[in-house]
């Protein structure tokens, strides 16, 4: 059998426009291939003809050489020049056939859409003398769009691909590592090289990769707009004549940034962490109080949680600690401002990867302004804060998220009398979150939540420890109740159910914004229905144990009783089953977008189905006409059992050996070696009519879907309340899981102020890392001492101990059990820390300046009910200056009318000798050892807190642990001993002079002279 030419890649569907054929020879003039740039195929989801492969329409040069195998002795070389196929030998029949195929191919492009610039051709079109300066229709459309949106990267659908053009393409190609097709690099053609090209440079990627690439682009802090076709080819053909020859209309379908990507994009239901879930959008303004201080007015929006935080705070030219704290809490990614911010504030915001956008105050629609007034009524917003709301509303309209600002229940103040605010220094130094909540943080220790929205609420709880004793007790009661009831089938089933719950809070907010997908809304309703079924199934248990006054849960936990009661009543109020029945489940699972949209509703239950049913009737009529046409075709071909090849393209297949007697007006769609496929003129018109009706159905079901979403949105408040109650339950469950750890105990809260008493307490974070942690007691009170001086060797556990105390207090006030045998504590309104040594090059601050600024902030913000942690203050400067500053700070606090509780670690032992009733001295215990070959004493850390003072930091022991050479350490020890002896000698010589000065002083009373002499004696003994 002879070989046939291998040219199957040319067999693609021919144009939908009528093309007649006589005896296999096309009556069509040659088409100039140079004009076939960017020809636009229709898109998927009824926007692209079925079977059309735009990617295959690439023309790579003016001359294309195709090597083929045929049965002749010499293999011919076939060339395609300017759209005409020629051959070098006798195989002219084959060349003629190939020429016909090539012309068919060109008609696919030209007839699909008369736009000569929307195709998938990756041809580099260089400008020639004959070429016009005029842009192609697609490029002109791109230019018009881009000039209106210069602040965005435009990702534009063209057929089965998304493309970026000009300067956008240059940026995107570098980030995504995809090919850049040369062309004009600037949209305004300002680049001198642009004159060499006829079209814009571009890069492209398949439409199925949109979400992946979109996430990458916004992760690089780009603002990206996705542009989609807003009309179909069928509707275009049936529209007015003036638009038929133009490009497809395109509109921006969505705008995305890092802050908006998570809420405006659909993800799989089991995805817990979403890009931007903790990020927020700020709008901020300020006014100067004086030359040093300024008031800042801020509104923060988290689109995922729906929270709107408003706040007024002060910053100075020397300290922006309040701004630091709010950045830690709210993670701004976009910051709007109506006036230029101070340079220090801008620098800090840029340091947190925030994009700062200057916005003008604009007048907005009167009706919207009334809605804003209504939603903010009762919040007592200052005039400075209120004027920011319309600016933020205007900005959010670009992302279709502006509706959030009209929900009054979402507004919350940053600070409240109900909870503590941990400042930025405390969050950092106590390891509250670590690296994004990673291993070794308090959040990691407590986060046993099963849902993503529960995890976010737990994060809020940790950042906002409670200040109200009753609320703390309510949480602890709920934790107790869960621990005892967890094995009950109601809780066991509910807890298991939570492990597979999607992010319901994110979904309900997406419903409010109108951006949710069909699949997502189905799973949302299905999940809410599951909760409803579960509570209904266990209604007897809930009535007897929760609702009844004699029930175990009712008696043991008011918080849990309230949660379960309100969830039950809320689920009954919303007829979720009725709403869910309106959805055709099979369509949700469809991969075909058209079917997913057009068949979404169960028309037996959907109560606005009249128009949809009418259009479906029109579609069925056309299908009946196609069936009648098939009967006529059967008679012509004398094949009574003939059927269309499929019910998509409605093709008639005829063997090539039987094509001679076919009607001349039948349209060849494509051919293979064995068969040819045809449309009749009637079937072609009916197919176009059918496609038009299908597109109308698509649009109608889209419209009805948005109305369906609005119906669910009407129950936003009730659904949001239920979801927040479920999140609270999830947090209680997480605290119960933590509290069941070995040797955790429920803390006892006392009304007595300034009191902590803990037995065998441990650092919860260090212990959770499977480290054998040595427990220590904590005793702070009026009688036991309110100011603890803690000395001891380097790495002896001083810093871990003071962190442990703060973490115990946070756990207790969050509502968790604590790692101790016993703990009794008062409630603290603030935890202020100065821990660690580091500089801040970004702010131009040295280690010592950072220290002093933090001390200044502590002194400014402390109250008598605060807990202060001061770790080795004065280490950032010389020894003498460090001693002086440390002494002054200790002296300041112990002489306050009411000194707060202070834990002060130091390497200056003399501070422990300060005479004060509230000051107590402790050290971290150790054992000295002498090893062979070492001149200095080695130590073994015992990590046990002892009463008293140690006179050495044993820094050389740390050098040994760091594996410094022994000779170097021995030499360092000899120098250290020499300096110590010289210092002792100098002080001994000065002792008589100091004694004489005290005794001869007329300013001191006899009792004061005795105290000074005793202090002098203590100092000399220490030295």
From Swiss-Prot:
Gene Ontology molecular function: any one: Y-form DNA binding
Domain of life: Eukaryota
InterPro entries: DNA_mismatch_repair_MutS-lik_N, DNA_mismatch_repair_MutS/MSH, DNA_mismatch_repair_MutS_C, DNA_mismatch_repair_MutS_clamp, DNA_mismatch_repair_MutS_core, DNA_mismatch_repair_MutS_N, DNA_mismatch_repair_MutS_sf, MutS
Residues engaged in binding ATP: 792-799
Organism encoding this protein: Vanderwaltozyma polyspora (strain ATCC 22028 / DSM 70294 / BCRC 21397 / CBS 2163 / NBRC 10782 / NRRL Y-8283 / UCD 57-17) (Kluyveromyces polysporus)
Protein name in UniProt: DNA mismatch repair protein MSH3
Compositional bias annotation for Basic and acidic residues: 19-40
Annotated localization: Nucleus
Family of this protein: Belongs to the DNA mismatch repair MutS family. MSH3 subfamily.
Cross-referenced SMART domains: MUTSac (SM00534), MUTSd (SM00533)
């Amino acid at each position: 059998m002879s070989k046939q030419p291998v040219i199957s890649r040319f067999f693609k569907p021919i144009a939908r426009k009528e093309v007649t054929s006589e005896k296999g020879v096309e009556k069509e003039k040659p088409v100039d291939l140079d004009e076939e740039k960017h020809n636009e195929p229709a898109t998927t989801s009824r926007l692209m003809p079925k079977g059309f492969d735009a990617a295959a329409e690439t023309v790579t040069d003016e001359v294309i050489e195709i090597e083929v195998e045929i049965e002749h002795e010499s293999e011919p070389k076939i060339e395609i020049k300017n759209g005409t196929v020629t051959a070098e030998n006798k195989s002219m029949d084959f060349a003629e056939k190939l020429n016909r195929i090539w012309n068919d191919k060109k008609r696919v492009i030209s007839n699909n859409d008369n736009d000569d610039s929307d195709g998938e051709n990756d041809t580099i079109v260089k400008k020639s003398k004959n070429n016009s300066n005029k842009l192609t229709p697609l490029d002109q459309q791109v230019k018009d769009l881009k000039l209106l949106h210069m602040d965005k990267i435009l990702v534009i659908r063209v057929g089965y691909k998304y493309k970026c053009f000009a300067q956008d393409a240059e940026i995107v190609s570098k980030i995504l590592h995809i090919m850049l097709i040369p062309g004009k690099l600037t949209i305004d053609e300002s680049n001198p090289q642009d004159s060499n090209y006829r079209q814009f440079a571009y890069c492209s990627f398949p439409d199925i990769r949109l979400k992946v690439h979109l996430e990458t682009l916004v992760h690089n802090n780009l603002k990206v707009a996705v542009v989609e076709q807003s009309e179909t080819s069928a509707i275009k053909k049936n529209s007015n004549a003036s638009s038929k020859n133009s490009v497809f209309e395109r509109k921006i379908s969505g705008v995305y940034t890092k802050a908006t990507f998570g809420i405006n994009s659909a993800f799989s239901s089991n995805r817990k962490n979403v890009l931007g879930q903790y990020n927020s959008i700020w709008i901020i303004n300020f006014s100067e109080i004086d030359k040093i201080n300024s008031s800042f007015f801020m509104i923060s929006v988290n689109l995922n949680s729906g929270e709107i935080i408003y706040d007024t705070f002060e910053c100075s030219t020397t300290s922006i600690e309040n701004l630091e704290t709010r950045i830690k809490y709210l993670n701004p990614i976009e910051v709007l401002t109506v006036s230029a911010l101070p340079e220090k504030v801008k620098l800090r915001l840029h340091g947190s990867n925030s994009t700062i956008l200057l916005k003008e105050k604009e007048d907005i629609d009167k009706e919207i302004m009334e809605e804003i007034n209504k939603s903010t009524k009762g919040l007592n917003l200052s005039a400075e804060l209120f004027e920011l709301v319309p600016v933020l509303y205007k900005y959010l309209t670009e992302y279709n998220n502006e509706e959030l600002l009209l929900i009054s229940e979402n507004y919350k103040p940053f600070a409240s009398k109900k909870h503590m605010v941990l400042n930025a220094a405390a969050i950092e130094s106590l390891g509250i979150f670590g690296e994004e909540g990673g291993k070794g943080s308090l959040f990691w220790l407590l986060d046993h939540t099963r849902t993503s929205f529960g995890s976010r609420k737990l994060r809020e709880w940790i950042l906002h420890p409670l200040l109200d004793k009753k609320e703390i007790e309510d949480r602890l009661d709920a934790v107790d109740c869960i621990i005892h009831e967890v094995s009950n089938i109601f809780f066991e089933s509910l807890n298991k159910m939570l492990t597979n719950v999607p992010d319901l809070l994110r979904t309900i907010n997406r419903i409010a914004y109108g951006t949710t997908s069909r699949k997502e809304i189905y799973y949302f309703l299905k999940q809410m229905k599951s909760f409803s079924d579960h509570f209904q199934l266990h209604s007897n248990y809930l009535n007897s144990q929760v609702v009844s006054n004699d029930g175990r849960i009712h008696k043991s936990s008011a918080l849990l009783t309230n949660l379960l009661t309100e969830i039950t009543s809320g689920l009954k109020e919303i007829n979720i089953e009725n709403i869910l029945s309106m959805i055709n489940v099979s369509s949700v699972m469809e991969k075909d977008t058209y079917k997913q949209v057009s068949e979404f509703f169960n028309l037996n239950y959907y109560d606005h189905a009249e128009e949809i049913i009418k259009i479906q009737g029109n579609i069925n009529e056309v299908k009946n006409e196609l069936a009648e046409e098939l009967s006529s075709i059967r008679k012509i071909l004398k094949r009574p059992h003939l059927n269309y090849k499929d019910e998509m393209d409605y093709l008639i297949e005829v063997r090539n050996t039987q094509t001679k007697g076919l009607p001349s007006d039948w349209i060849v769609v494509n051919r293979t070696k064995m068969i040819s496929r045809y449309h009749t003129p009637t079937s072609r018109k009916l197919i176009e009519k059918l496609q038009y009706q299908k597109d109308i159905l698509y649009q109608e079901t889209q419209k009805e879907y948005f109305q369906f979403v609005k119906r669910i949105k009407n129950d936003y408040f009730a659904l949001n309340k239920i979801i927040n109650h479920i999140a609270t339950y999830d947090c209680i469950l997480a605290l119960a899981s933590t509290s069941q750890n070995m040797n955790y105990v429920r803390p006892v809260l006392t009304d007595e102020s300034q009191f902590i008493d803990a037995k065998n307490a441990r650092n919860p974070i260090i212990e959770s890392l499977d480290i054998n942690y040595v427990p220590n007691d904590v005793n702070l009170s009026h009688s036991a001492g309110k100011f603890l001086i803690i000395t001891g060797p380097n790495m002896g556990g001083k810093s871990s101990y003071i962190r442990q105390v703060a973490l115990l207090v946070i756990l207790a006030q969050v509502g968790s059990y604590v790692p101790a045998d016993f703990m009794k504590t008062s409630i603290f309104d603030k935890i202020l820390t100065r821990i660690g040594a580091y500089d801040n090059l970004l702010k131009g601050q040295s280690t010592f300046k950072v220290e002093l600024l933090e001390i200044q902030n502590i002194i400014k913000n402390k109250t008598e009910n605060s807990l202060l942690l001061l770790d080795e203050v004065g280490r950032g400067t010389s020894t003498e200056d460090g001693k002086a500053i440390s002494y002054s700070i200790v002296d300041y606090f112990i002489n306050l009318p009411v000194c707060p509780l202070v834990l002060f670690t130091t390497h200056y032992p003399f501070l422990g000798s300060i005479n004060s009733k509230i000051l107590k001295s402790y050290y971290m215990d150790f054992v000295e050892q002498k090893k062979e070959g070492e001149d200095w004493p080695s130590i073994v850390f015992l990590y046990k807190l002892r009463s008293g003072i140690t006179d050495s930091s044993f820094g050389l022991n740390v050098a040994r642990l760091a594996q410094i050479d022994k000779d170097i350490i021995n030499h360092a020890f000899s120098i250290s001993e020499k300096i110590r002896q010289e210092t002792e000698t100098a002080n001994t010589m000065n002792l008589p002079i100091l004694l004489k000065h005290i005794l001869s002083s007329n300013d001191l009373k006899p009792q004061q002279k005795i105290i000074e002499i005793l202090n002098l004696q203590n100092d000399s003994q220490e030295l």
